[in-house]
Amino acid sequence: MTNTKILEDNISFEEALKELEEIVKKIDNGQESLETAVNSFERGIVLKNHCEKKLKEARLKIEKITKLADSTVVLEETEI
């Protein structure tokens, strides 16, 4: 995969993380050429940023849900 490929917003966190892990393994292996390793590293940075964005979005959503749950009052029906 080339680093010129634009990371689409619809790539899932899990897909991005898996690709990032594969890149780390390839670089750690040390069998790639310098140019390929640099390109892989660049792609890894894009994937890392994407994962951080997805995590931030999830954290904000959880905070919003938690605040909503904390402020919701549940009224029980009473028998008359």
UniProtKB/Swiss-Prot annotation:
Q: Where is the signal peptide?
A: none
Disulfide-bonded cysteines: none
Q: Which GO terms describe its cellular component?
A: cytosol; exodeoxyribonuclease VII complex
Q: Which reaction does it catalyse?
A: Exonucleolytic cleavage in either 5'- to 3'- or 3'- to 5'-direction to yield nucleoside 5'-phosphates
Give compartment(s). Cytoplasm
Documented EC number(s): 3.1.11.6
Q: Which Gene3D superfamilies match?
A: Exonuclease VII, small subunit
What is a single molecular function from GO for this protein?
A: exodeoxyribonuclease VII activity
The family database entries (Pfam families) matched by this protein are listed as: Exonuc_VII_S (PF02609)
GO annotation terms (biological process)? DNA catabolic process
Keywords from UniProt, A to Z, are: Cytoplasm, Exonuclease, Hydrolase, Nuclease
What highest taxon heads this organism's lineage? Bacteria
Which family, according to UniProt? Belongs to the XseB family.
Q: What is the recorded function of this protein according to its Swiss-Prot or TrEMBL entry?
A: Bidirectionally degrades single-stranded DNA into large acid-insoluble oligonucleotides, which are then degraded further into small acid-soluble oligonucleotides.
- UniProt cross-references to PANTHER family, sorted A to Z: EXODEOXYRIBONUCLEASE 7 SMALL SUBUNIT
Assembly, per entry: Heterooligomer composed of large and small subunits.
The identity of this protein, by name, is Exodeoxyribonuclease 7 small subunit
| Native organism | Rickettsia canadensis (strain McKiel)
Q: Which gene encodes it?
A: xseB
